[in-house]
Amino acid sequence: MTNLRKTHPLMKIINSSFIDLPAPSNISSWWNFGSLLGVCLIVQILTGLFLAMHYTSDTMTAFSSVTHICRDVNYGWLIRYLHANGASMFFICLFLHVGRGLYYGSYMFLETWNIGVLLLFAVMATAFMGYVLPWGQMSFWGATVITNLLSAIPYIGSDLVEWIWGGFSVDKATLTRFFAFHFILPFIIAALAGVHLLFLHETGSNNPSGLCSDADKIPFHPYYTIKDILGVLLLILVLTSLVLFSPDLLGDPDNYTPANPLNTPPHIKPEXYFLFAYAILRSIPNKLGGVLALVLSILVLAFIPFLHTSKQRSMMFRPFSQCLFWILVADLLTLTWIGGQPVEHPFIIIGQLASILYFLLILVLMPITSLFENNLLKW
């Protein structure tokens, strides 16, 4: 009798994706982040569902409903902080996952990579709308500033902003629709993640060497299931430590003040994981230019496969490209720091230089260095 997991229509799909999947024998812990992102998404959907049971998307009661969740609902404080800090963990895993893809040349799987870029945009949109929901000062002003950027679009800009707002300012209509979108988007993200996996399993995983691993495959279960469980346990350890010891470490104190349209906070800044993009936005004095740079800072990832000039896929054996990669990482950390600083000297010039370096590295220096390394192979 054939095993049920190989014959049952539904089990067959699960089996070919998570049990009998042929995987390269040499993939490192950098390949754990895909499964960690899946765990993060499940945690976010579950905690979000329980929060939505008690939350009210009305400007008069939104702030107090969040307070009610933290004070009166059984373990409401835990659910709320798991959701808020879970988002931070989600983005940390996302950035490490993308970084892994850049370093080891996983972007050569075009369909998988492009769906990944789309997923990144979807997750960023979801996180932005979620940040608006508690209706604190930073929620309100963050929503006002970021939605206002669309007014930079020529001709249709101002109409578009008012259409998104549902009025002449960020108000009840905006909050209600943001809640609706924030609720539906994670399910769209889950569907996209399924497509992401579908495309990945068409080609099989990449590996650190960047070479074809067809000659040396091992089954996903038990080898990588055990490895993934270790990653999940570490993720849970970090998340619970953050939630139970310093839940407000990554938050903004201004968001504990109810939204007040008549009082602007001294420094409007987004959540920790958006600061690098915010720094790029602020470093360009022109509004439209800033918006384009903001979008391009993520969209540039979609161009990377076409800028691959190296004869080798991975950076494992390319020391010069490795140097540039780590300079890019340092540059992103610099941008993150700048995004949280006030707009004054010397932060303005540092932000501008870091923004120029970011695009220069990806679009110019890395492809040229790859060509140089190709020539070194001839020696």
From Swiss-Prot:
UniProt GO cellular component terms: mitochondrial inner membrane; respiratory chain complex III
Binding site for a ubiquinone: H201
BP term (GO), one: mitochondrial electron transport, ubiquinol to cytochrome c
Domain of life: Eukaryota
Cross-referenced Gene3D superfamilies: Cytochrome Bc1 Complex, Chain C
Pfam families: Cytochrom_B_C, Cytochrome_B
Cofactor: heme b
Signal peptide span: none
GO terms assigned for molecular function: metal ion binding; ubiquinol-cytochrome-c reductase activity
Entry's family note: Belongs to the cytochrome b family.
Function: Component of the ubiquinol-cytochrome c reductase complex (complex III or cytochrome b-c1 complex) that is part of the mitochondrial respiratory chain. The b-c1 complex mediates electron transfer from ubiquinol to cytochrome c. Contributes to the generation of a proton gradient across the mitochondrial membrane that is then used for ATP synthesis.
Quaternary data: The cytochrome bc1 complex contains 11 subunits: 3 respiratory subunits (MT-CYB, CYC1 and UQCRFS1), 2 core proteins (UQCRC1 and UQCRC2) and 6 low-molecular weight proteins (UQCRH/QCR6, UQCRB/QCR7, UQCRQ/QCR8, UQCR10/QCR9, UQCR11/QCR10 and a cleavage product of UQCRFS1). This cytochrome bc1 complex then forms a dimer.
Other information: Heme 1 (or BL or b562) is low-potential and absorbs at about 562 nm, and heme 2 (or BH or b566) is high-potential and absorbs at about 566 nm.
UniProt-recorded name of the protein: Cytochrome b
Gene name tied to this protein: MT-CYB
